[in-house]
Design a protein with these regions (language model features):
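Short amphipathic alpha-helical interaction segments
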Residues: 140-155
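Residue-level detector of family-conserved "landmark" positions at structurally sensitive sites
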Residues: 43, 146, 163-164
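Accessory beta->alpha helical hairpin/"wing" motif in late/C-terminal subdomains of nucleic-acid enzymes
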Residues: 162-176
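C-terminal scaffold of the Radical SAM
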Residues: 1-141
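A short, conserved structural fragment
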Residues: 154-164
Length: 176
């Protein structure tokens, strides 16, 4: 659990259980949801078959999205770069900056060297992982460039790798 700044949880932090208790609670939750027909398809999401959140799947597949409105985030792939943007967080600042023609408060260009990490950080949240072709289409890089690191993670029991799919193992889902 991450207690985000500027939230009620950060202001009034609850007492959190110890590691083993957390693991036991997670296993109990997963078992109960599985018994009700819900699969843990993503690190923090459960759904019945065919009911997964398509909006979030786009994030985890490193797809593009355009955020509109105060505090909204975007990820945009252009022909020569990938950008992450954040609109002005506070509505009054957002409106003022829209009028001035500067709706973006922060913009980060993701360098080509950072794309493998960005992609894997998202795609390995999914229990089903991703096909290697998706990596190549979303990063414009060959999977061979990261294959040694993927094979090392497989040797550590964190990934299952086949020609069709790269996915976290149950152990990998706990630690990746």
């Amino acid at each position: 659990v991450t207690l985000e700044p500027n939230t009620r949880f950060a202001a009034f932090p609850p007492e959190l259980p110890e590691g083993d208790t957390c693991a036991d609670m997670q296993e109990a939750i997963e078992a109960r949801l599985a018994g009700a027909g819900f699969a843990n398809y993503e690190t923090s999401a459960f759904a019945q078959t065919g009911k997964q959140c398509r909006h979030n799947l786009n994030y985890w597949h490193f797809g593009d999205y355009l955020g509109i409105g105060a505090g909204a985030h975007s990820k945009l792939t252009l022909h020569d770069r990938v950008l992450r943007q954040m609109r002005w967080k506070h509505p009054s600042a957002y409106l003022q900056n829209i009028r001035a023609g500067t709706p973006v408060q922060e913009e980060t260009r993701i360098a080509a060297a950072g794309l493998p990490f960005e992609f894997l950080m998202n795609a390995l949240r999914l229990a089903d992982g991703f096909p290697p072709a998706l990596y190549e289409s979303r990063t414009a890089q060959s999977i061979n460039g990261i294959l040694p690191r993927l094979l090392a993670a497989q040797a550590d029991g964190l990934l299952a790798i086949s020609p069709e799919r790269i996915a976290p193992t149950l152990r990998g889902r706990r630690f990746l």
